[in-house]
Structures are given as structure tokens and as C-alpha cells.
């Protein structure tokens, strides 16, 4: 038998992994037993008689114990220099030579004995250093704290009442492929409420409902049912409303087969194209006498009202930029929980580009100087956000302040809307009873069938939406009472004591105590009075409108000069309180009822601003607020007690100085976070006090508000303290009734959200309004402190998408370290060992650099963006809407700590993910070994000659054909994400096989190859979430029998490098070491990948696939450097070293 040389090329680092023989386990046990006993003198004599050698004969084992020679970058084998006895050792198993170079440490020789060379230490992929373990535990601890805080702290209460309906749907089958190519995939329906709508004829105003991501067309039923019932029970009996142009609403809804629009830009465009054709068809129905039942004197409809939920709101805005959009067919858009500001995820390039096209179009349209140049001049957009309970789409993304001016749209939160006053989750915003009532009534209020557009003019529509959706206390709120005509003639006795002295407060603890109708007259200070006077009134009783006979009415009155024989018949309502006295004064009065602001009732028994199903209905408070300039043309405010029997109820009315009731606390955010903020309301205070804190803008921070108890000297409070926190832009208000403690969170300046068109970020801030009983002569102490644990939960919704990017930052740095150690020492260290080395230097340096980069960009940014958008003035404007897109999405230096925080969390996540991958591969390896069958009659010698099937792969021709077929499918039918998923599965199987061999035969070559394949598998797994959404969309299309070839993602080059690399690894071919300058290319590619993932990964996550794809292309090239650049070399790239295995070793 020929003896083979121990220096065979099979031990090269670039060779295939060593295959374990059948007796490998027996040898390992024997070796372990022998190593457990000390060496005897006889053993030393045997070693001395034997010639020095570091290899063991095949008679004892087939395993080569010699350290493998390294292959340089040119593919030649380098012989290791002889060892030096005095060279110092290295922790990585290296020794220093005389010329200062590091090389692998070999066994030293002594003159007395020759010790056999030891096997390089086995590097377990499960092992983790103490420092890496601590970092991982800290990171996972932070992540658990964030998740725990998000579900336990700073939670908004749920206050939605259940809604009920009796739905039916009529499918419009005539809207078929003759109208649109997408009719075979999508369907159009007309909603009808049972027992109310008697047929399917259209006779009202068209409204189109667009469902959101994976939404159902049946989601229209709560709002459509409320609209049908409200018209049937109320409006059709209101003659004034019918004369004003109100008609019932015809709700159309679209069945998108629960399409996934959030993950696929082409699907979004397809839906917009289909809906434009649907709008054209809907408008044509009103021209067909067979299906329309309308007054022939009314104009035919030329536009529809659009109601969109979630991504349906984005589809609605997309319709206006599509080529098939019919001009002026949409002029009113109401969206609910729609992410207008940015895509919810950035995994698809077409989605990101579509968002950019939509938002650029809208901004460009509203920046035009003249209305005729603005194609969206008549369009109004109202975005309604659910608030903190919406955990599907961050409500920060619902902001349209960066898209439309306040003359054409606004953003409002459901907690702001009167009589709603609660946050809502992503689905509850559709069925919440009190909310759907407001939406239905608001739509009816903008309808006017006397116009072809079926709606009122734009300015009037905006006025209506602000009335229904805003509190009425905003600075833009318009007061209707001063502009109205006098409705009431009030006659009072000149000798009456009902006139309140100027400067005094009117306080009524009960109504009707006088036993007769009584008017309390409060003189109005003249305009321009010092202190900027304002009038405020609060009561728990509903204020009457003109002509109503309730308990209380508030009027603004002017004295009518007395003229003989003057007729008073022009007043619809007259109240004579003079009791027949000759000395009387007549007042012409306007009702304040149109300007009443509803506030949640705050008593000692209330807990929330709302009431739930089964609870007693709570009557809200009525509040009036006017500046003196608004009512300066009147002389008196008349508070009329119309009830004549003692009735529970209070009234507090006063004129107060604006300077006394409003204050601004200029405190830095750092001081507020460190020391908190304290202030007090004095005993002699107005009923309403307001405190503005401009530094409270960030949506990442949460606070706790505490209010001390007030002493009323034995009397009961008229009402419990009521607190309102609000932002001026967007319109977000939250109410706290019976307030003693309150949790404060807001949706202000948020990460990755573009700045508003006005750019007035520094002027805005969080404000607090306090309604307190002014009759209690005691001060109130208020304290605002930061809630750091509650603030952690706010990071979840704002930064959950970083897990699509930042882990790649960690993985790329670890891979870079693994390749650098491998090119230097020939050892491809395990992933966790590479992570430990990175934690000692690379990761801290990178985080420090990224922090300084963020700080420098924030300093260099123009101060508050000096050039803003100016409307209709012709000035050029520059606004950077992308400066929040990078890194952590904010340039505020206060939040720079988030960079290392996110990084340490990702270190923990990557560590856990690595152990999960190790567990998966080991389990699969165990399963594979269980199904492997070795016949018992095969002898040991035959087992030695048998090459295991671990890396027996199909022939090169078959693999090339398989790859070609897969790429052909990508080109024609399937998206490249499908091929990438296949590549991940193949890489998993390769890693499992490499793990089996490395565990059965512990050698450097096997360990290197396993660690290499495992790290590539980890990299591919972190890229997989970016590709899975598009794959899910493709599978969904197949599930709904939409067999049209996928319309995007067919670029073969986007996946070919991954396929080639994975196929190369299936041959067991280890990547060669790069001894020349080419090794720096790998390092630079991985370094660039890490930087790109950290800086651009969140906003442009889809590009990470392309970056990793380029890395795979480079690694495939490096694999091929062991051969010449020829067709034979390309074949060898696929075939590995199968030929070597067939030829065996050469002597």
C-alpha cells in the first residue's frame, strides 16, 4: 500500500472540507482516553526512536493532523517557516517570528524529546466571551424594557362604543373588462342599508370608500349605515337642510381581494388606475335613467367624495397623479389612519418612489403662485389619526402639514374631535360609534346637490370640516355669532338689578332659583382695553339655540334706540322681562349657540372624557370663549335663565385679562428632563389658565402631570379640574377630567417625518389649559416631570423599522472582522468571536463616528430653514423635506444617545438570532443523521474508503441548468425575491451539512468552512425580511387566481450573484485567502455596507439587498480566483473539487 504524503493539497485552506470517515467517532473516543493519562517513559522512548513527523499513518487513522499550509492570493501553496522557540505567543494561536510577522504557532522541539504537534484549538460556534455576553444581555434588557413600556405605560384609554348596522352589497357586474383591464381582479359594490334603502338605484351624492392594506370592502358598513340612518331619521325631515342641497349618500366600495398595498408599489398604482376608471363609471350611472332616480332639475354629478382608510388614503391621493385621472372628478378626500408623510415600510423601491412622486406632485401644486396653475386648488384633504392606540401605523405619519397648506387641509387626532375624545386603534377608527356619527354628519354638511361638484365651495368645505373636527378653541377657529343676524328681541327693566358690575364674575350654583325667567347682563369692555380682555363662560347645561325652550341661553346684545311706532316683528324670538314697566330697554341680541365648544364633563365622579356601552350618558360641558374685539360692537352679554323651577346646574362667566391667564415657560428641555417644572395657579385666578412650554415638541418623550387638591372652604366644587393638552400643528388635544394625575404624551416632532410647510417648529410647543373652580380661594400647585420608563415605550412605534437595517450594520462589521482574521491567520473565526472582537474596537469607533456625523449635520443645517413656502407671492422657496431621512431621523443633539442604544439592542438581537440559527442548523443536522442509513455488514476498511454524501451535489451541468431555469422564471413570471428565498433555503442546507462534518471531524478546514457558511447564512437571513413582503404579495396574487405575470421585480442581476455564491458553497469550496491588496476590497465593501445600513437603511431599506448582492458578486469572484479566468475555471466554480475526490491523493 502506497503511503501518502502528509503535505497533500487536500489540507489547503481553499480545499473542500474534510469528510469524516466511518471510524471517526471511534478515533475521537480513543484519542480522548489517551489524552487523559500522563505520558510514560516508554512513550518518550518511542517518540525518540521515531523520526520527527507531524503526520500520523493511515494505519491508525485517516485523519491528517498536520496544520494545513495556507494558500496565498495567487493560489500557490506556501510552506510554513520553521518554528522559533523564543517567539512570544498570541491569544489567537499566533507566534512572532524574527522579522516581526505573525504566523501559526507550531509545536516546539526540545533536544530531549519530540512532542507530536497538537491540533489547533477547536473554536465552538456556541462559545461567547464575557464582554459579548454582557453586551447582549444589556441589549436584550433594553429591548424588553421598551416592549414592556409600550404595553404597560403611557397608554391611552379605550373609549369607543360599539356600532351596529344591517348591511347589504350590490355588485356592479357591468363594470367589467370593457372598462378596465383590472376588472377580473377587483370588483365594485354599492352599499345598501337594509330596511332603509328600498332598491339599488342611485339618487344621492356619490361617495367612494377605499379600503387599506389587506382591507375588506365590507369595512364601509359602519359609516355607510350611520349615514343612511341619519338621513332617514333626521335630515329628510329637515326642510332647511333639504333646501340647502342635502341628499342621501350613495356609498360605493371596492373589493381589492385584500391586496397588500403597503409592501408593493405596483399594486398601489394598479389600485389607483382601477379607481379612476371606477369613478368614471360611477359618474356615468347618474346619467343612466335605468339606474338613477334623481330630480331632473339637479345638475349631473361631476365629482365624488373619497373616504380612504389606511393605505386607501394614499391610493386616493395617487389617483390624482395617474394618467387616467378625470380632471375635477375628486375634490374632497377624508382619510383615516393613513401614512401620508412617508411609507410605513421601505422594503420596496417602487413604493418609496411612488410616495416621492405623490408628495412632490402635491407640494409642487400648492406652491404655485396662481390658482389657475394649481391642479389641486379645489381639493381639500383632511387626515384623521387614531393616536397612541394605533400600533399598526405611527400616527406621526398621518401628518399632512408637509403636503398641503392650512387653507386646503389639516391633520386632526380623534382625541381632539368634540364628543369623541378618545384614541383609536387602526381598525376601531372604522367602527367607533361616536366617531362615525361625526364623519357622517360632516360629509352631509359639505354636500350641495345644486352644484355639479355635489359639494360646497372649497373655503366653505374647510370651514365645515374645522367646525366638526376641531375643538373650536384653535386660533384659526372662526366665530359665527358676531357675523350672524339678530335673532332675539330682549326687553329688560331699567331698574332691574340684573346688570353685573364691570369686572365682577357671574357665578350661578343652581338655575331657576328666582322662580321666573331672568337675564344677567354683563357689560362688555371697550375694544383696546388694557390687559387684552376676553370673555369666557362654562356651564354644565346645554345652551339653547334661538327659538328653543330649554334652561339656558347666552346672547350678545346691543341697545336699540327708542323710536315711536317702531315695529319689532322682524325678530323671530322675543323675550319681555320688563314686567310691564314703563322704564324698559330693548336689546337686539345674537345667539352664541353656534360658537359653543363642547368639553368633556369633569365632576368628582367622572374618570374619562367618554362613556362606554352600558354606562350612563354624560352630558358634556358647554364653553364659550371670545376676545373682546370679536364682540366689541355689542354692549352686553346676556345670560338668560329660562327655567322657572330650581334646577341643578352651574354657570361661571367672566371677563379676564389675557396676560393673567396665559403664560409661557421658557425652560430648556434638558432642565425639564433633569429637574422637572413646577408652577402654581394663584388663589385669585381666572377660571381658565393656560401654560405653554415651547420646548415640549418631541414625540419621543413622555411626562407625568400632577395637580394638587384645592380647598373650597367647606363648599363643594362647582366642577373638578379639567385639563387639556394640545398642539397647534397638527391638531392634537387630549382631555383629562377630574384631573389629579395625568400621563402626557404627544405626536409632535417625530423621527423621519418631514417638516411642515410653514417651518414654524420653534414657535410651536405643547400647551396646557386648566379649567378650575375660581370660587375656591386656594392656590393650585402643578408639577410636570419626565417619565423615562414611559418614554422607552415611545421608541417602539418610531424605531421598530430600524431592525430592518441596523442589525446589518452589526453583521457587516462582524463579517469584516472574520475576513480580516482569516486573511491574516488562516482561521475563519466563529460569528460570536468576531462579534467580541468588533465590540472591542470596530463597533465603538463606528458609533462614535456616526454620532459625530449626526451632530455635525445638525450644526451645519440652516437655522430653522430660512426660506419657507410662500403662497401666491411669487417668492422662490427652498425646503428640505428629506433632512430627517437619515440615521435616527432627527438632528436634535439630545437624542444622539439613541445611536449607541439602538446599536447595543441590535447586538443583543444579533446574538439571540445567531443562537437561533445555530439551534436550527444543529436540529436539522440531528434529523439528517437520524435518517442516514449505514448497513451493518459494511466493514471498517470499506467505511474508510467511503466518501460521505454530505457534499455530494448534482453534477455541474445539472446545477447550471437549474440555475438557468430559476433565472428564466425570474425574468418572466416570478419575482427575484422568490429566487432569493430559494437561495436562503439552499444555504441553510449547506450550513447544516458543513456543521455535521465540522462536528464529526474537528479540523481547521472544516471549522473554517462551517463558520464561513454560517456567517453568510446569517447575512442572508437579515436580508430576507426585506424581500419577504414582495414574495407575500406574489403568493397573494396566486391565491386570488390573478395569474397575470408579476409586473415588477424581474431583474435577474438582483439575485444572480447570490445564486452563484450559494451554488459555489454547495460544492464545499472554501473561499481562498486574499494575500494581496485585493483583501482590502472585501473589507471596504463590508465597511461600506455597515455605514450604508446605519445611515440610509431605515429610509431606503430595499437598497440593502442590492448592497448585499454586490458583496455576493465580489465573493463569487474571489471564489473563482483559485483558477484561471476561463470557461474551465467557471465550470470549476460550480464543480468544486469533485475531480480531486475522484483522483485521490498524489504521493
UniProtKB/Swiss-Prot annotation:
Composition skew (Low complexity), residue ranges: 50-63
Catalytic-site annotation from UniProt: 310
Regions crossing the membrane: 127-147, 795-815, 843-863, 893-913, 918-938, 965-985, 1015-1035, 1052-1072, 1084-1104
Enzyme Commission number(s) from the entry: 3.1.-.-
InterPro entries xrefs: AB_hydrolase_fold, PGAP1-ab_dom-like, PGAP1/BST1, PGAP1_TMD
Its job: Involved in inositol deacylation of GPI-anchored proteins which plays important roles in the quality control and ER-associated degradation of GPI-anchored proteins.
Name listed for the protein in its UniProt record: GPI inositol-deacylase
Species this chain originates from: Chaetomium globosum (strain ATCC 6205 / CBS 148.51 / DSM 1962 / NBRC 6347 / NRRL 1970)
Amino acid at each position: 500500500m502506497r503511503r501518502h504524503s502528509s503535505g497533500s493539497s487536500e489540507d489547503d485552506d481553499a480545499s473542500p472540507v474534510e469528510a469524516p470517515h466511518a471510524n471517526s467517532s471511534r478515533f475521537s473516543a480513543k484519542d480522548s482516553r489517551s489524552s487523559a493519562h500522563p505520558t510514560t517513559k516508554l512513550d518518550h522512548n518511542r517518540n525518540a526512536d521515531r523520526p520527527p513527523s507531524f503526520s500520523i499513518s493511515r494505519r491508525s487513522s485517516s485523519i491528517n493532523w498536520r496544520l494545513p499550509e495556507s494558500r496565498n492570493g495567487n493560489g500557490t501553496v506556501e510552506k510554513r517557516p520553521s518554528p522559533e522557540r523564543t517567539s512570544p505567543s498570541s491569544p489567537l494561536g499566533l507566534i512572532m517570528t524574527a522579522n516581526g510577522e505573525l504566523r501559526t504557532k507550531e509545536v516546539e522541539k526540545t533536544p530531549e524529546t519530540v512532542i507530536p504537534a497538537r491540533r489547533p484549538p477547536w473554536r465552538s460556534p456556541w462559545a461567547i466571551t464575557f464582554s459579548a455576553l454582557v453586551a447582549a444581555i444589556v441589549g436584550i434588557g433594553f429591548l424588553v424594557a421598551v416592549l414592556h413600556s409600550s404595553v404597560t405605560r403611557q397608554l391611552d384609554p379605550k373609549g369607543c362604543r360599539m356600532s351596529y348596522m344591517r348591511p347589504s352589497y350590490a355588485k356592479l357586474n357591468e363594470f367589467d373588462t370593457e372598462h378596465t383591464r383590472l376588472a377580473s381582479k377587483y370588483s365594485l359594490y354599492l352599499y345598501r342599508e337594509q330596511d332603509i334603502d328600498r332598491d339599488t338605484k342611485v339618487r344621492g351624492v356619490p361617495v367612494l370608500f377605499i379600503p387599506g392594506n389587506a382591507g375588506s370592502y365590507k369595512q364601509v358598513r359602519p359609516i355607510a349605515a350611520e349615514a343612511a340612518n341619519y338621513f332617514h331619521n333626521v335630515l329628510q325631515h329637515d326642510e332647511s337642510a333639504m333646501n340647502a342641497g342635502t341628499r342621501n349618500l350613495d356609498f360605493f366600495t371596492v373589493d381589492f381581494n385584500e391586496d397588500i398595498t403597503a409592501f408593493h408599489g405596483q399594486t398601489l398604482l394598479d389600485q389607483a388606475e382601477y379607481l379612476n376608471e371606477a369613478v368614471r363609471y360611477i359618474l356615468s350611472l347618474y346619467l343612466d335613467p335605468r339606474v338613477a332616480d334623481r330630480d331632473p332639475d339637479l345638475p349631473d354629478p361631476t365629482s365624488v367624495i373619497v373616504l380612504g382608510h389606511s393605505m386607501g388614503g394614499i391610493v386616493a391621493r395617487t389617483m390624482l397623479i395617474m394618467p387616467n385621472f378625470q380632471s375635477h372628478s375628486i375634490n374632497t378626500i377624508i382619510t383615516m389612519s393613513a401614512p401620508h408623510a412617508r411609507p410605513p415600510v421601505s422594503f420596496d423601491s417602487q413604493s418609496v418612489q411612488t410616495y416621492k412622486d405623490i408628495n412632490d406632485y402635491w407640494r409642487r401644486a400648492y406652491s404655485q403662485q396662481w390658482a389657475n396653475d394649481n391642479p389641486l386648488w379645489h381639493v381639500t384633504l383632511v387626515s384623521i389619526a387614531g393616536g397612541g392606540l394605533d400600533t399598526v401605523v405611527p400616527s406621526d405619519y398621518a401628518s399632512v402639514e408637509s403636503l398641503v397648506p392650512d387653507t386646503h387641509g389639516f391633520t386632526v387626532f380623534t382625541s381632539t374631535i368634540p364628543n369623541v375624545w378618545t384614541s383609536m386603534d387602526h381598525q376601531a377608527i372604522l367602527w367607533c360609534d361616536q366617531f362615525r356619527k361625526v364623519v357622517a354628519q360632516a360629509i352631509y354638511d359639505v354636500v350641495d346637490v345644486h352644484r355639479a361638484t355635489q359639494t360646497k365651495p372649497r373655503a366653505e368645505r374647510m370651514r365645515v370640516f374645522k367646525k366638526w373636527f376641531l375643538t373650536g378653541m384653535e386660533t384659526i377657529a372662526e366665530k359665527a355669532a358676531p357675523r350672524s343676524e339678530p335673532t332675539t328681541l330682549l326687553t329688560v327693566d331699567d331698574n332691574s338689578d340684573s346688570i353685573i358690575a364691570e369686572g365682577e364674575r357671574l357665578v350661578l350654583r343652581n338655575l331657576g332659583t328666582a322662580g321666573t325667567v331672568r337675564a344677567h347682563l354683563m357689560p362688555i369692555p371697550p375694544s383696546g382695553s388694557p390687559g387684552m380682555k376676553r370673555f369666557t363662560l362654562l356651564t354644565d347645561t346645554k345652551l339653547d339655540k334661538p327659538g328653543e325652550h330649554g334652561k339656558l341661553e347666552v346672547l350678545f346684545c346691543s341697545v336699540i334706540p327708542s323710536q315711536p311706532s317702531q315695529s319689532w316683528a322682524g325678530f323671530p324670538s322675543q323675550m319681555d322681562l320688563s314686567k310691564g314697566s314703563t322704564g324698559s330697554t330693548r336689546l337686539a341680541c345674537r345667539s352664541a349657540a353656534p360658537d359653543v365648544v363642547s368639553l368633556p364633563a369633569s365632576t368628582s365622579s367622572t374618570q374619562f372624557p367618554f362613556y362606554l356601552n352600558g354606562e350612563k350618558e354624560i352630558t358634556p360641558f358647554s364653553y364659550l370663549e371670545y376676545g373682546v374685539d370679536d364682540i366689541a360692537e355689542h354692549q352686553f352679554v346676556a345670560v338668560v335663565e329660562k327655567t322657572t323651577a330650581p334646577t341643578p346646574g352651574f354657570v361661571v362667566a367672566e371677563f379676564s385679562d389675557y396676560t393673567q391667564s396665559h403664560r409661557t415657560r421658557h425652560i430648556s428641555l434638558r432642565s425639564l428632563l433633569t429637574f422637572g417644572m413646577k408652577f402654581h395657579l394663584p388663589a385669585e385666578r381666572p377660571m381658565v389658565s393656560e401654560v405653554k412650554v415651547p420646548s415640549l415638541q418631541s414625540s419621543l418623550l413622555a411626562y407625568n402631570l400632577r395637580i394638587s387638591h384645592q380647598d373650597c372652604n367647606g363648599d363643594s366644587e362647582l366642577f373638578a379640574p379639567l385639563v387639556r393638552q394640545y398642539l397647534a400643528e397638527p391638531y392634537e388635544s387630549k382631555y383629562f377630567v377630574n384631573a389629579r394625575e395625568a400621563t402626557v404624551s404627544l405626536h409632535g416632532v417625530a423621527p423621519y417625518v418631514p417638516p411642515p410647510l410653514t417651518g414654524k417648529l420653534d414657535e410651536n410647543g405643547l400647551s396646557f389649559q386648566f379649567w378650575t373652580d375660581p370660587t375656591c380661594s386656594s392656590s393650585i400647585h402643578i408639577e410636570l416631570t419626565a417619565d423615562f420608563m414611559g418614554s422607552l415605550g415611545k421608541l417602539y412605534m418610531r424605531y421598530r423599522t430600524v431592525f430592518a437595517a441596523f442589525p446589518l450594520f452589526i453583521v457587516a462589521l462582524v463579517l469584516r472582522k472574520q475576513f480580516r482574521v482569516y486573511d491574516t491567520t488562516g482561521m475563519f473565526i466563529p460569528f460570536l468571536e468576531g462579534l467580541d472582537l468588533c465590540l472591542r474596537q470596530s463597533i465603538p469607533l463606528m458609533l462614535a463616528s456616526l454620532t459625530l456625523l449626526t451632530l455635525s449635520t445638525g450644526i451645519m443645517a440652516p437655522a430653522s430653514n430660512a426660506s419657507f413656502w410662500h403662497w401666491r407671492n411669487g417668492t422662490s422657496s427652498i425646503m428640505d423635506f428629506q433632512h430627517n431621512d437619515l440615521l435616527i431621523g432627527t438632528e436634535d443633539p439630545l437624542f444622539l444617545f439613541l445611536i449607541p442604544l439602538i446599536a447595543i439592542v441590535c447586538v443583543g438581537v444579533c446574538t439571540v438570532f445567531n443562537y437561533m440559527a445555530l439551534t436550527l442548523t444543529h436540529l436539522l443536522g440531528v434529523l439528517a443523521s437520524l435518517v442516514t442509513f449505514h448497513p451493518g455488514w459494511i466493514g471498517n476498511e470499506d467505511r474508510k474508503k467511503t466518501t460521505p454524501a454530505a457534499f455530494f451535489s448534482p453534477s455541474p451541468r445539472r446545477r447550471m441548468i437549474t440555475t438557468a431555469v430559476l433565472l428564466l422564471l425570474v425574468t418572466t413570471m416570478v419575482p427575484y425575491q422568490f429566487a432569493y428565498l430559494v437561495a436562503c433555503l439552499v444555504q441553510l442546507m449547506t450550513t447544516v451539512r458543513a456543521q455535521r462534518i465540522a462536528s464529526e471531524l474537528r479540523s481547521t478546514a472544516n471549522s473554517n468552512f462551517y463558520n464561513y457558511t454560517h456567517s453568510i447564512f446569517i447575512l442572508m437571513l437579515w436580508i430576507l425580511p426585506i424581500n419577504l413582503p414582495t414574495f407575500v404579495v406574489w403568493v397573494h396574487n396566486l391565491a386570488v387566481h390573478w395569474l397575470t405575470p408579476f409586473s415588477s421585480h424581474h431583474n435577474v442581476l438582483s439575485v444572480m450573484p447570490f445564486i452563484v455564491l450559494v451554488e459555489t458553497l454547495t460544492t464545499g469550496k472554501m473561499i481562498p485567502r486574499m494575500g494581496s491588496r485585493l483583501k482590502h476590497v472585501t473589507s471596504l465593501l463590508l465597511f461600506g455596507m455597515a455605514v450604508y445600513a446605519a445611515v440610509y437603511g431605515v429610509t431606503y431599506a430595499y437598497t440593502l439587498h442590492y448592497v448585499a448582492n454586490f458583496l455576493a458578486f465580489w465573493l463569487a469572484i474571489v471564489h473563482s480566483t483559485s483558477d484561471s479566468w476561463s470557461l474551465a475555471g467557471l465550470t470549476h466554480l460550480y464543480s468544486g473539487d469533485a475531480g480531486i475526490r475522484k483522483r485521490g491523493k498524489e504521493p
